[in-house]
Amino acid sequence: MQIKLANPRGFCAGVDRAIEIVNRALEVFGPPIYVRHEVVHNKFVVEDLRARGAIFVEELDQVPDDVIVIFSAHGVSQAVRTEAAGRGLKVFDATCPLVTKVHIEVARYSRDGRECILIGHAGHPEVEGTMGQYDASNGGAIYLVEDEKDVANLQVQNPERLAFVTQTTLSMDDTSRVIDALRSRFPAIGGPRKDDICYATQNRQDAVKQLADECDVVLVVGSPNSSNSNRLRELAERMATPAYLIDGAEDMQRSWFDGVERIGITAGASAPEVLVRGVIQQLHAWGATGADELAGREENITFSMPKELRVRSLL
């Protein structure tokens, strides 16, 4: 059995920044540091930060007064920001800048009196935060659609004053079909010049297509609640390549590789490389060889830290 590695894979710039914000806050201010929602969707990362003194909560009413709170990479609604400000909580915002870009678009559509359609997955924290940027007090509304069926059933107030945005971690192929359906049903709809799916999601989906084309089975390292990791598994399966989403080596079964010659490995944008190395080590113990990285797209994007943490870390 030969191992092939997707390129790129694993951490993106937004995840790197979010984790570093929590780490630096712990270093500068000491524990406990409260984090609203898992800072990124990866069990290994969350447990490591929890061991260092991070406390993960789902709502601000679980946060005591006079502590530091970090908003996760997925972003939060304006209502959450207002609640934090009203309580005087010290907040560091780890929202991915590419998610913030979508938030700004939604707020602009609201101010302009346009209704907004968000393409995304119900219940995902990024979706909840993005929908919470729309101020419906002026009579407008924001709608959530997941697929073409939702578009066909959608009723809006004014089809002539309508715009769309997308969750950043969706399948590019699925999203393209939904956008086509929106434009067909609502010809006057506006939107971004390209969809809001982030560079890292696009690059990892392109890479897994190449991997699935060259391998007999694909392993996606990522947690079950990671949207972008699930999309990678689905994409490989659509290419008729068996694919498994695993948190780490401990989730693998030896029988998956019976009769397999080429094993492909990729990782979602919130999965650290150490987990990939653990998978490779276990596969080597089962007789696999190599770990050749495919040619891919280089990523050199970085996002800046909050000023206070950036300055304090240099002291």
Swiss-Prot record:
Pathway: Isoprenoid biosynthesis; dimethylallyl diphosphate biosynthesis; dimethylallyl diphosphate from (2E)-4-hydroxy-3-methylbutenyl diphosphate: step 1/1; Isoprenoid biosynthesis; isopentenyl diphosphate biosynthesis via DXP pathway; isopentenyl diphosphate from 1-deoxy-D-xylulose 5-phosphate: step 6/6
Family matches, as CDD domains: lytB_ispH (cd13944)
Binding residue positions for [4Fe-4S] cluster: 12, 96, 198
Cofactor, how bound (note): Binds 1 [4Fe-4S] cluster per subunit.
Enzyme nomenclature, EC number: 1.17.7.4
GO aspect biological process, one term: dimethylallyl diphosphate biosynthetic process
Keyword Amino-acid biosynthesis in annotation: no
Binding positions (dimethylallyl diphosphate): 41, 74, 124, 226-228, 270
Recorded GO MF terms: 4 iron, 4 sulfur cluster binding; 4-hydroxy-3-methylbut-2-enyl diphosphate reductase activity; metal ion binding
Enzyme class label: oxidoreductase
Pfam families registered for this protein in UniProt: LYTB
Residues given in the record as (2E)-4-hydroxy-3-methylbut-2-enyl diphosphate binding sites: 41, 74, 124, 168, 226-228, 270
Parts forming coiled coils: none
Keyword Iron in annotation: yes
Reactions performed catalytically: isopentenyl diphosphate + 2 oxidized [2Fe-2S]-[ferredoxin] + H2O = (2E)-4-hydroxy-3-methylbut-2-enyl diphosphate + 2 reduced [2Fe-2S]-[ferredoxin] + 2 H(+); dimethylallyl diphosphate + 2 oxidized [2Fe-2S]-[ferredoxin] + H2O = (2E)-4-hydroxy-3-methylbut-2-enyl diphosphate + 2 reduced [2Fe-2S]-[ferredoxin] + 2 H(+)
Binding site for isopentenyl diphosphate: 41, 74, 124, 226-228, 270
Residues at the catalytic site: 126
Cofactor section: [4Fe-4S] cluster
Keywords: 4Fe-4S, Iron, Iron-sulfur, Isoprene biosynthesis, Metal-binding, Oxidoreductase
Database matches in NCBIfam families: ispH_lytB (TIGR00216), PRK01045.1-2 (NF002188), PRK01045.1-4 (NF002190)
Function: Catalyzes the conversion of 1-hydroxy-2-methyl-2-(E)-butenyl 4-diphosphate (HMBPP) into a mixture of isopentenyl diphosphate (IPP) and dimethylallyl diphosphate (DMAPP). Acts in the terminal step of the DOXP/MEP pathway for isoprenoid precursor biosynthesis.
Protein family per UniProt: Belongs to the IspH family.
Descriptive protein name: 4-hydroxy-3-methylbut-2-enyl diphosphate reductase
Gene of this entry: ispH
